[in-house]
UniProtKB/Swiss-Prot annotation:
Molecular function as annotated in GO: lyase activity; nucleotide binding
Presence of the UniProt keyword Nucleotide-binding in the record: yes
Record-given protein name: UDP-N-acetylglucosamine 4,6-dehydratase (inverting)
Known EC number: 4.2.1.115
């Protein structure tokens, strides 16, 4: 699907973008991979590692629609990974978060339309479901924008989808590198916000592969959610440092005890497939009549029961300490 195609990744110098680039280069023969991001140093460092002839690097901000549109010329597929995602920082700088996560999302949509992009997938987060913090609220708004974009496409062929998942093991700013840094510095204890806290976990590699597969299965308008394991934060801390004690510091601004990826309010829109769930659009598209119970590959899903929810504390899949360490070690080697 990606052979001889032009692919653009916003926020491409981040953990996801670099892994996505690695997977594309190892498994496909793209015509161009365009990395679109703000930080010239990160682009310089990434270019020293990913220097294949097909690589292109564009300095730009998703807030700048003109620059974004210029970078998207002749692009076939877009992955929108750029975001302001640090929860407490977003709480203290709300308008900056809104400019990047909401205005930036609309700029991506407009640039896709202007350049005839075939498909665009936006990365979302479990924090967008029943949000209690500004980051989650902006990502919910972003999700809504990308879903609704399919309805305003008119005679344009661009299709938009959303991929929503939980904490990415090893990604920049996540708890795993934070804990490992404390351990390497000789910490005597690890800070835990609440002993009851649970989270969804996915490796960078699995996250990338899930997004890749969604390009093939999407009609346009779906929110795709992978079936991934949960784990208690205390189990993670014990797995990384079994001999260290834990210090309870309390929940930070905007945090939840448990994350939700599908709320019961969306159960009537949700279909279960073998390895994932798909939330169909809540609005009826004017000129499209897709059957979202069957994906674009012809695979059939089943409607979930009314009142179904998918939360990190009611998840049937739980990662053991051994399994999580395997994910962490594999991610570092990847």
């Amino acid at each position: 699907m990606f052979n001889k195609k032009n692919i653009l990744i916003t926020g491409g110098t981040g953990s996801f973008g670099k892994t996505y680039t690695k997977v594309l280069l190892e498994n496909y023969k793209p015509n161009k991979i365009i990395i679109y991001s703000r930080d010239e140093l990160k682009q310089f460092e990434m270019a020293s590692v990913f220097n294949a002839p097909c690589m292109r690097y564009f300095i730009g901000d998703v807030r700048d629609k003109e620059r974004l549109s210029a970078a998207m010329r002749d692009v076939d597929f877009v992955i929108h990974a750029a975001a302001m995602k640090h929860v407490p920082i977003a709480e203290y700088n709300p308008m900056e978060c809104i400019k990047t996560n909401i205005h930036g999302a609309q700029n991506v949509i407009d640039a896709c339309f202007e350049n005839g992009v075939k498909k665009c997938i936006a990365l979302s987060t479990d924090k967008a479901c029943n949000p209690v913090n500004l980051y989650g609220a902006t990502k919910l708004a972003s999700d809504k924008l990308f879903v609704a974009a399919n309805n305003i496409a008119g005679n344009k062929q661009t299709r938009f989808g959303v991929t929503r998942y939980g904490n990415v093991v090893g990604s920049r700013g996540s708890v795993v590198p934070f804990f490992k840094k404390l351990i390497s510095e000789g910490a005597k204890e690890l800070p835990i916000t609440d002993t009851r806290m649970t989270r969804f976990w996915i490796s960078l590699e699995d996250g990338v592969k899930f997004v890749l597969s969604n390009f093939e299965r999407m009609h346009g308008g779906e929110i795709f959610i992978p079936k991934i394991p949960s784990m208690k934060i205390t189990d993670l801390a014990h797995a990384l440092a079994p001999n260290l004690s834990h210090k309870i510091i309390g929940i930070r601004a905007g945090e939840k005890l448990h994350e939700i990826m599908i709320s019961s309010d969306d159960s009537h829109l949700t279909y279960e497939f073998e390895n994932y769930y798909a939330i169909s659009p809540s609005i009826k598209f004017v000129d499209k009549d897709n059957d979202f119970s069957i994906n674009a590959l012809g695979e059939k899903g089943q409607k979930v029961k009314d009142g179904f929810s998918y939360s990190s504390d009611n998840n049937p899949l739980w990662a053991s300490e051994k399994e999580l360490l395997e994910i962490i070690n594999h991610t570092e080697g990847f």
